């Protein structure tokens, strides 16, 4: 299940299996590739590339912004991850490109934090949130460039933000909330 998958994707031993490769492409069964651009994405040299998580306009409303700020102050500690933390980040893991040496180094450096993720449940502790939020030294593509790699959450908004251009691929295309778009 999801716990086993998260455990594997946060395991140094998993990435060591690919030590003779520069990158690995994670392409889950609910991902789709539209164009042959993998080599181009590898050439950019990023540590991690995944679909960006867009911040919808509703979160810019003053009352909502105030609520999110208060939520951070009341419930967020230094290591506490809240759902709002992923807004504007690059990181969905279902279709993602990962630099093997960087993943191995992060699994070593953040081993304690990875174990915390493995022990906790909930979407904010899925492995892709770890990769998007924990390794601060990782080189990620800017949000706008990541739109050219993949869409996952809110594909209609991503398509608009990408000025009507489809990405290299997508993830989660058959989810109920996404299927009408795809």
Predicted features and spans:
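A short acidic, often aromatic-flanked loop/helix-cap motif at beta-alpha or helix-coil junctions
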Residues: 1-5, 56-57, 150-154
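Alpha-helical elements of Rossmann-like donor-binding domains used by nucleotide-donor carbohydrate transfer enzymes
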Residues: 13, 40, 48, 102, ...
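Short beta-strand-to-loop acidic/aromatic patch adjacent to the donor-nucleotide binding site
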Residues: 21-34
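Catalytic core and acceptor-binding pocket of nucleotide-sugar-dependent glycosyltransferases
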Residues: 77-182
């Amino acid at each position: 299940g999801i716990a086993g998958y998260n455990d594997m994707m946060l395991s140094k031993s998993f990435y060591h299996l690919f030590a003779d490769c520069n990158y690995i492409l994670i392409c889950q069964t609910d991902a789709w590739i539209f164009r042959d651009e993998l080599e181009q994405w590898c050439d950019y040299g990023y540590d991690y590339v995944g679909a960006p998580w867009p911040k919808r306009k509703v979160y810019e409303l003053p009352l909502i912004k105030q609520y999110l700020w208060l939520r951070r102050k009341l419930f967020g500690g230094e290591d506490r991850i809240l759902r709002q933390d992923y807004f504007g980040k690059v990181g969905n893991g279902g279709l993602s490109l990962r630099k093997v040496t960087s993943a191995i180094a992060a699994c070593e450096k953040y081993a304690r934090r990875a174990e915390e993720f493995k022990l906790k449940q909930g979407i904010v502790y899925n492995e892709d949130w770890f990769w998007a939020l924990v390794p601060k030294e990782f080189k990620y593509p800017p949000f706008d460039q990541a739109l050219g790699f993949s869409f996952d959450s809110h594909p209609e908004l991503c398509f608009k933000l990408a000025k009507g251009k489809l990405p290299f691929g997508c993830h989660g295309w058959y989810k109920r909330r996404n299927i009408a778009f795809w």
